[in-house]
Each structure stands twice: as C-alpha cells, then as structure tokens.
C-alpha cells in the first residue's frame, strides 16, 4: 500500500486544528509530530479518513505517519497572521472552462499561502467588469464565476488570493478623459507602455492616485485578500501635466502605504505587495506597510550571486520576507538536464540567502 496524506490547508493560524487526509482503509496509524528533531507531545485523533492534530504554538513542524510498512512524511507551519510568512504563487486562467479548482488544490499541496490572480481584471484602470463574462485587456475570455470559485477555494485552503493591479497603467479612453492625470516626458509627450497603456501620475496630489486606490478597495470588497501592486521598472524620471518633475522614489512609498490603509478599510486582514522591479526603488519602499518584499529580477541581475545579494540586501533593508520573481528559461526550449541543474543552482543560491 502506498501511503499518501494531504494537509487541508497550506498554512495554519494559531488556534486552528491541523487536519490530514488518509488513504482509504488506513486505521489507527502511528503518528509523530516534530519540531526540528524534537518530538512534540500532542494528542492525535482519527475521525473517518482524517487525522486531527490539536492547535499548536507558532512554529514549523514535521509529521511522520506510519501504517504497517508504509510511511509518509510532511511538514506544516503555524503563524499568528498569514501576512507574517509569504510563499507566493500565481494563477492566470479564468475562463468559463476554468471554474474547477484543481489548480488551487495543487498549490495547497505545495504549501503556497498567497496566490496572485494575474491579469484577472477587466481593464488596468477599471478592475471589476460591468458584466460576468468579459475580455481581459489582452482579449482573453474571462469569467467572474471562475474567479469567485478560485477565491473561495483559496480561502478554504488557507491561501490568500491576491488581485493583480498595476499602479500607474490606464487605457487610452481614460487618458483622453483625464490627460491631467498622466505622466509625461520632459518635452511634454504622454508616456506609454507598449504603445497602448498610458502611464498615470501616482503622486498624492493627482486624482489618479485616488482613482486607483478606489479600484483596489473594490477588488478587496469583491473577495480578494490583497493587491499585487505592479510596476514596469521604468520610467524612473517623469513629469506631470504642468511640466513639473515627479519624484517616484517619494511617490511610490506614499502610494504603497495609502493602498495598505485603503484595502484594510474593506478587510482588516488584507494587505499589499509591491513589485520592486530589479530592486528599484528598494531603499525607498523597504519600510513601507507592504506584507513582503517582492523583486522581479532582470539583467544585469542574472548571476546566481545576484539572486543571493538581492535577497540579503532586501531583508537587511526591510526585515521582511523576500519573494523573487526570477524567471528561468522555459524547459521546453532548453536541454532538460541542463535546465534542471540551472534550477537547482538557482534554488541553492536563494536558499543560502
């Protein structure tokens, strides 16, 4: 018999029981809970095909289950607040055919406790759609029913569903309505990303910042547990509609803190995570009220040592957990053995930090 157990949650909060599912036919298995190498004295009971551990103190634990000659080992953690420990993943398929939640089940088994819903929105400047089914900004079919199902599955599994939200991107229509909200070059040209998204001025004095914060609040009111505040890494020097320079290193920390406050008016447990693309502007945003430090890695940070350094410096600046979006070359386009070795080396460098 092959013994495979599953935790019912990706992470546990203090006061919650820890539940493990058992294969059919397994009765009264031997169970040992560890903290590092030390056994933890706790009473374990079985109810049907479920092992139930009592609420445990904050910490990380291992558990071994034996039934006859078969053995299974796993691990789990207990935290006071899920924002204290972040293991980050993402989902990107929300069509009418994607209302099932096997993807969330898989993330639960991997212990991811925060999941970004990437490109779920109707528009960059209007996150929630006017109808249930819609086309996202890239023209892909999207269904709110699928999003609702995955949000509910995440919350039931101890996973925080995080809504993607770009901090300064707007469609041409909104730019035409509010050109005074845009960011400009020094010679007065409106700045665009990929030729179709307009950069908006995030300074507190600009109406755009109130607009996007209201959109973030709506997303949390819809059911999300926070916002992934995305940036594109550039530009770094911009001007407003009156040809005045806008200091993004000053404006971004203020926006992050205002966003954290805004989403918590809808849900006190909600939070924000800001994408400091290629570690910019790390020193400015490190001490903001974001839940974790998130760095999307691009050249010239393309060596293993760079991954190590990014994490060490970000942790030193912020005292928070660090999430790296470090993109490996797709395995389909590379030698499989070489790609796996590259992954293992990357993981070793990250773990060493």
Positions of predicted regions on the chain:
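Extracellular ectodomain segments of secreted/surface proteins
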Residues: 1-26
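Extended acidic/polar, glycine-enriched regions
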Residues: 40-84
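An acidic-aromatic substrate-binding cleft motif
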Residues: 72-123
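Active-site-adjacent "subsite" loops/lids of carbohydrate-active enzymes
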Residues: 93-97, 163-222
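Short, acidic/polar
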Residues: 94-109, 208-220, 276-284, 339-347
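Aromatic- and acidic-residue-enriched carbohydrate-binding clefts of CAZyme catalytic domains
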Residues: 121-147, 174-203, 233-250
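Active-site neighborhood of glycoside hydrolase catalytic domains
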Residues: 204-293, 298-318
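Active-site-proximal substrate-binding groove within the catalytic cores of carbohydrate-active enzymes
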Residues: 285-288, 304-353
